[in-house]
Amino acid sequence: MSRKVQKMLYVGDFPVPTGFGVVSKNLVSHFKKHYDMHIIGINYYGDYDPEIEGLKVYPASAGNGDVFGVDKFFQILQQVRPDVCFILNDVWIGMEYGAKIKEFKTDNPEAKTMFVLYTPIDAENIKPMFVEGISPYDKVITYTNFGKTQLELGGYKGKIDVVPHGVDTSVFKPMDKKEVRKAMNIGVDDYIVLNVSRNQPRKKLDLFFFIFSEWVKRYNLPPNVRCYYHGALRDVGIDIMQWVEYLGIQDRLVISNPNLTANRGLSEQSMNMVYNSADVFFTTTAAEGWGLPIAEAMSTGVPAILPNHSALPEWTAGNAQFVPVYPFPSLADRGLNTIHHIINVDEAVKSLQFMYANEEARKNLGRDSYKHMTRGEFNWKNIASRFMEIFKNG
C-alpha cells in the first residue's frame, strides 16, 4: 500500500517576480515532490500556475481589498485541512493570518495541522503586538539570527528556528562581461554601478542616486561612469526620472526596461546578464531581512557595497564592502516603527571611489563573494530539506 501524501497549504507571493515570489518559486519546486500542494498566491490573479504542473493555486485577492487573502485563507484552510500550513510574509501580515489560525484551532480542536511562519525581520524594534499576534503558530522561522534576536527582544517566548535564503547558482553565475555588455548594448569600457531593488521607501533610492551624483561630481569622473537601476521607474517610491534629471545624471542612467513593474520583471536568465554587466553592486537600503538581489549579484562574482546594519553583515559573513550608517534612528512609516538606518553619504562616496580606483580589490572581493554564495548552506534543495526536517520533528 502506497503511503498517503501529506497536504501542504502554502501562502505567499506566487508566481510573481517579487523577492517573496523568488523564495516561493524555489521552495515550492522542492516541496511539491513531497506534498500535495495547495497555494494561496499573493499578487496572483489566475486560476492555476501554467508552468508548474500538479499545483492547486488560488488567487489571494478576491477583489475586495483583501490583497493578502486573509479571509480566503480561513475558507481554504477549512476546505483543504492540510498537514502543514506554511506562510511566508512579514510578521505584521503573519499576525493577520495568526488571528484566523487561532479561530481555526478553536473551531477544530481535533485538527493536526502544523502552522509555520517563515518571516523576514529586517530591523530593530518589533512591536510587542506583532509578536503576540504570531503566538498561534506552531513554528516560527526567521532568515537570520539577527531576526531571531529581534523577535525575542520583542517578547517572543517560544523556540525560533533559523533557516537562510538561497540562490540558484545554476542560473546566477559568472559570464563574460564584455560579451554580456555587447548583447545589452552597454559600452564595454563603461564602469557600471548597479542597484536592483523595488522602488519603495525602505530601499532609499533617493539616496542611491544622490550619492552616485555626489561621487561623480566630487571626483570629476568621466561620462562612462554610469549607474544602472533595475526596477520600476514609478512604483510606491520616488519618481526616478524626475529625480535623476534634477541631479543632472540622466545621461549616466542605464535602465532595463521603462515598463517594468513590481509584478512584471525579466526572466532569470536576463537578470543574470544584468548582474554580470556590473562592475559593482551598491544598495542604500535602510533595513534588510536578507536581500536576494545582493545574494544573486554576489553569486555572479560582482562585489557589493552595503550599509552596515540589520541582517546584512551576518549572512554575507564579511564578504562585502560595508559602509557605516548615521548614529540616529529613522522609523519606518505606516505605524510599523521599526528602526531604519541611513547610510553615511560621505563614507558611501569614499567606498564607491575606493572600488572604482582599485581593480584588484574588486576582483578579490568578487571572487570571495562567489565562493561564499556557492556554499551548500545557500542551496535551495538543502534549504527545503531543512524545512521538511523541521516539519517532521514537530
PLM regions and their residue ranges:
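Nucleotide-activated donor-binding/catalytic signature segment of Leloir-type glycosyltransferases, i.e.
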Residues: G237-M273
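Aromatic "clamp/platform" in nucleotide-sugar-dependent glycosyltransferases that forms part
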Residues: A286
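Conserved donor-binding/catalytic core segment of Leloir-type glycosyltransferases
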Residues: L9, G187-K203, F209-F212, C227-Y228
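Short hydrophobic beta-strand element within catalytic cores of glycosyltransferases
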Residues: I294, P303-L306, Q321-P324
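A charged, aromatic-enriched C-terminal amphipathic alpha-helix characteristic of glycosyltransferases
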Residues: I343, E347, A357-E389
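Carbohydrate-associated surface elements
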Residues: F146, G166
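A short helix/loop element that forms part of the nucleotide-sugar donor recognition site in Leloir-type
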Residues: K173-I186
